[in-house]
Amino acid sequence: MTEKIIRFNDVHICTESFGEINNPTILLIMGATASMIYWEEEFCKRLSNQGFHIIRYDNRDVGKSITYEYGHPEYTFEDLADDAIQVLDAYKVDKAHIVGMSMGGIITQIIALKHPSRVLTISLIMTSNFDSSLPKKDNKVTKALSELKIRNWQDKDEVVECFIKKSKVLIGSKHIFDEE
């Protein structure tokens, strides 16, 4: 695994890559408030061992990438999609298989629409396209998730507590949640 910081337009994005750059690339885009490490290292290594070049990265306001004043993001979903293209450019990748989870899936869809020539395939996990005909999220889930904010990413206890609360909401009622 190799870490690389990509800098452009007063933005810096932290990336990590696995495997040979000449192999077909899979770009992994995680969701809101989730670091690239949610794409576990073992998962990335297994994909690279199958002949792929893997890139994972932290979106803005997450992990080692640029952060903004709390509650005042200075970017849009389209900017996040353009960030992904900047990542591909930094690795000199013309086209990639793009995998997006949650908000990463929204970013992936925007990439496919704005930059179709850069996309080999897309894979979407736990995401939506905001079509008004789709069923809506339960209001208590939306409310709970909107109230869970991490104000200090350097405070490990705050981060862990927030992710436990978030996971508790997302697990639903079918399974027992183990906080340990």
PLM features per residue range, with description:
Residues L120-Q154:
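Flexible "cap/lid" loop of the alpha/beta hydrolase fold
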Residues S102:
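Catalytic nucleophile serine of serine hydrolases
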Residues T25, H53, D94-H97, R118-T121:
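Structural signature of beta-strand start/N-cap positions in the alpha/beta core
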Residues T142-E180:
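Alpha/beta-hydrolase
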